[in-house]
């Protein structure tokens, strides 16, 4: 049992003398029950066990709300069709979507497939394109040739041998990414990760998506309501109605009256109307670790309709932050994420315009405030937060949507049978998400701590006080052994595997002093995988179409259904 679950009883009671009674074995050796609930606790426990969870109410739409609705509804389709379970989403007609164009993680492919979405339809209706990773330019020194890839493919033979020490022993000037995977070369060439004959959701090279968040949410809404039986209510929530124990009983809306539920999912964005507002769960700020607190977003048209379209996100370092550059079929989504403590808004806009070039003329950027961090608790009473209501981190590694997916899947799979067991599931959910958010913060910070850039923003990121202790310990360890499974990366809760850390570390010039301890068999195996990566690179460069060509063919002909 985890430390956070110890002593937790249903309905939030803890094992204090008021509600738990324990007796020792007496002289007569008659064994009593280990504990018993007090009369009030027993009453609440029985009430909880008699209250099944049948009605899930999601407050808030957008990607978080509709993706969560889809995952839960797909998982419980049998009950929805039998009319013993319902998913209702309440969405304000007056609140705009925050999304500025999204990068995603490969998990979205399996998520969309499981809820029954056609990949062809995704491309046709969401201005979607392929994403094979991220290119980080200027993060180490700022020199013209300073760039590395964090691809979405694992190194060849990743589950059998760690190629990092063998690359370190004799890289011959070849980057780690190019030595162990073909994906950096595919991105350099602007190639797609599959062919038109590759079935939906299948891959030649691992991939995620770039997509328009403003189109993605309505696309999910249509699918959820027409195919999965999700009830859609367009209304503004005016009042949150709570029971004596703090549970939310219902919400009162302006247009649709009172809507009751057994489990409420807070997808109300930064304001966190239910978890942060009604239940008062505090926000845990991490701006002392991740300094960027503002973004300027700009949608940039292509010079020509058939202009090359990058199959990777481009993250370019600047004086006080970094720009994102996402290629969609009809435009580029760009923006500058920066620290307002290190640069003014006007100076940041000037840097963004210099990066975009002449195409920025006449375009007005949209300013977005960023508060990096998360709620201290993600699930309290009968309320669980997903998406921005749970927290937000700068979009450096496309973690926003994958966190929505993982939370939605966990809620769907662990859906409480009744209120009596909900607190047990909530404790598990909180443990998993505390770990995930902490590790993502570590991974994002890793991108900043190996820099040699001279600007104050970058130098401030090297302050040990801003580097989490776990990351400091791992950096010390990695001086002598490369990241691998035994650095806790075998946990199911991990979002970024050991390979992701390798790509960033060695892409930024980190050196590991590896002792030559591998036997001949391991060296032979590693040499074979490195040679395999080289041959695969040659073959795929000759076979795969360009990113834009494949997206156009998908629009014209569609992908083959599985």
Regions found by a protein language model. Give the residues of each.
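Low-acidity, Ser/Thr- and Arg-rich intrinsically disordered low-complexity segments
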Residues: 2-4, 11, 15-19, 28
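N-terminal Rossmann-like FAD-binding beta1-loop-alpha1 element of flavoenzymes
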Residues: 54-83
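Glycine-rich FAD pyrophosphate-binding loop
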Residues: 74-100
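Dinucleotide-binding Rossmann-like beta1-alpha1 core, especially the glycine-rich loop
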Residues: 96-187
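Predominantly flavin-linked oxidoreductase catalytic cores and closely associated redox partners
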Residues: 201-321, 327-335, 339-348, 408
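Conserved FAD/dinucleotide-binding core of flavoprotein oxidoreductases
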Residues: 317-369, 391-402, 414, 422
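Short FAD-binding loop at a beta-strand-to-alpha-helix junction that anchors the flavin cofactor
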Residues: 378-396
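Long, low-complexity C-terminal extensions of enzymes
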Residues: 413-562
């Amino acid at each position: 049992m985890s430390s956070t679950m110890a002593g937790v009883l249903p309905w939030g009671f803890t094992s204090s003398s008021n509600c738990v009674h324990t007796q020792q074995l007496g002289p007569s050796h008659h064994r009593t029950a280990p504990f018993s609930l007090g009369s009030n606790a027993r009453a609440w426990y029985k009430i909880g066990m008699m209250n099944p969870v049948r009605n899930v109410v999601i407050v808030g739409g957008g990607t978080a709300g509709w993706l969560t609705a889809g995952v839960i509804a797909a998982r419980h389709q049998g009950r929805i069709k039998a009319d013993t379970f319902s998913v209702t989403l309440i969405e304000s007609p007056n609140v705009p979507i925050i999304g500025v164009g999204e990068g995603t993680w490969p998990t979205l492919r399996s998520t969309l497939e499981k809820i029954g979405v056609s990949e062809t339809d995704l491309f046709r209706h969401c201005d979607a394109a392929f994403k094979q990773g991220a290119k980080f330019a200027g993060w180490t020194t700022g020199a013209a040739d300073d760039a590395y890839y964090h691809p979405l493919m694992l190194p060849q033979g990743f589950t059998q041998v760690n190629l990092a020490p063998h690359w370190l022993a004799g890289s011959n000037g070849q980057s780690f990414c190019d030595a162990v995977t073909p994906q950096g070369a595919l991105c350099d060439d602007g190639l797609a990760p599959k062919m038109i004959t590759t079935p939906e959701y299948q891959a030649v090279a691992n991939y995620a998506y770039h997509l328009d968040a403003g189109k993605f949410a309505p696309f999910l809404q249509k699918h959820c309501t027409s195919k999965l039986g999700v009830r859609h209510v367009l209304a503004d929530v005016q009042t949150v109605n709570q029971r004596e124990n703090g549970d939310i009983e219902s919400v009162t809306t302006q247009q649709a009256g009172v809507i009751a539920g057994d489990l409420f999912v807070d997808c109300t964005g930064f304001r966190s109307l239910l978890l942060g507002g009604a239940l008062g769960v505090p926000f845990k700020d991490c701006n002392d670790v991740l300094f960027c607190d503002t973004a300027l977003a700009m949608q940039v048209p292509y010079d020509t309709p058939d202009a090359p379209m990058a199959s990777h996100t481009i993250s370019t370092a600047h004086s006080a932050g970094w720009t994102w550059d996402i290629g969609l079929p009809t435009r580029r989504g760009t923006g500058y994420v920066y620290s307002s403590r290190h640069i003014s808004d006007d100076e940041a806009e000037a840097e963004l315009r210099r990066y975009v070039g002449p195409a920025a003329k006449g375009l007005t950027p949209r300013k977005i405030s960023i508060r990096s961090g998360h709620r201290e608790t993600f699930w309290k009473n009968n309320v669980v937060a997903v998406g921005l209501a749970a927290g937000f981190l700068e979009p450096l590694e496309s973690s926003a949507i994958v966190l929505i997916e993982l939370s939605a899947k966990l809620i769907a799979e662990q859906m409480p049978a009744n209120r009596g067991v909900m607190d047990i599931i909530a404790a598990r959910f909180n443990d998993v998400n505390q770990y995930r958010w902490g590790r993502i913060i570590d991974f994002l910070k890793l991108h900043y701590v190996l820099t040699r850039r001279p600007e104050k923003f970058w130098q401030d990121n090297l302050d040990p006080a801003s580097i989490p202790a776990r990351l400091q310990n791992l950096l010390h360890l990695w001086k002598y052994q490369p990241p691998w499974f035994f650095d806790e990366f075998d946990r199911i809760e991990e979002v970024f595997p050991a390979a992701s850390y390798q790509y960033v570390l060695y892409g930024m010039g980190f050196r590991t002093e590896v002792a030559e301890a591998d036997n001949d068999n391991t060296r032979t195996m590693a040499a074979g995988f490195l040679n395999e990566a080289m041959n695969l690179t040659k073959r795929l460069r000759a076979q795969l179409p360009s990113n834009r060509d494949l997206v156009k063919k998908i629009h014209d002909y569609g992908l083959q259904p599985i």
